[in-house]
């Protein structure tokens, strides 16, 4: 089939690579978000998908809005059979959805109808799910509500951050997306409506969502830190300044600390929660590089019992 691939961040690149490597489908063009400022100099930089497409000699379309008439006209000229989508980053209007003969097929990083929305991986970790996966579905105007072509499952490991899990899902999902394109072309793959039960929503994680509440249980604190790593980054407050929490580990045997209270050993830093303590392993103070929590604690000379979050 002739395809137009829509995607923007690094997590979409494995799927683009898989479609190119399949040899069965022609990726005639790529649709991605416009160049964005990046780095200290805030220079405009093309998206990872745009960079990969340019390396492969594929036409790149960067509409400010996917309803722009110039973009729609070019899409009609290309006349794609299907448009696979991975983390494009903009809502597609009905006029665009109607152009490809077989519609737009999205690779979503959850087992739909669970975790519809922008941050399914973060929410699955923060909720304590043990299994997640990826789904391919036909895009409709509703939020991730279209009928599903196929799924692949992935175990959530106890130490997974959202970055770890998303990387694995990006590669597992790329194979699923290629298989879905093959099935659509053959006419043998039928999309199945999502069940009405089991719908959960996964809105974008805000900075406030990433603020750690030390009165919650240790397992919840651990899940928030892992779910918000690498972005937006879990955080707390220490001596009036924000402290980023990069890695913690629950310590069930430490039940002597009040929520938010610090305890410093020779090479360990513990914090009380609503259940038992967690050990801080890696942190990042404002304006500083990430460092081991024990090194940070020595540098700021913590007093036992000093609070976090105040």
UniProtKB/Swiss-Prot annotation:
InterPro entries: Fmt, Formyl_trans_C, Formyl_transf_N, Formyl_transf_N_sf, Formyl_transferase-like_C_sf, Met-tRNA-FMT_C, Met-tRNA-FMT_N
The entry's keywords: Protein biosynthesis, Transferase
The enzyme's E.C. designation: 2.1.2.9
Pfam families assigned: Formyl_trans_C, Formyl_trans_N
Record's catalysed reaction(s): L-methionyl-tRNA(fMet) + (6R)-10-formyltetrahydrofolate = N-formyl-L-methionyl-tRNA(fMet) + (6S)-5,6,7,8-tetrahydrofolate + H(+)
A GO CC term attached to the entry: cytosol
GO molecular function: methionyl-tRNA formyltransferase activity
Top-rank lineage group of the source organism: Bacteria
Record: residues binding (6S)-5,6,7,8-tetrahydrofolate: 110-113
Similarity comment: family membership: Belongs to the Fmt family.
Matches recorded under NCBIfam families: fmt
Main function: Attaches a formyl group to the free amino group of methionyl-tRNA(fMet). The formyl group appears to play a dual role in the initiator identity of N-formylmethionyl-tRNA by promoting its recognition by IF2 and preventing the misappropriation of this tRNA by the elongation apparatus.
Name of the protein this chain belongs to: Methionyl-tRNA formyltransferase
Gene name as annotated: fmt
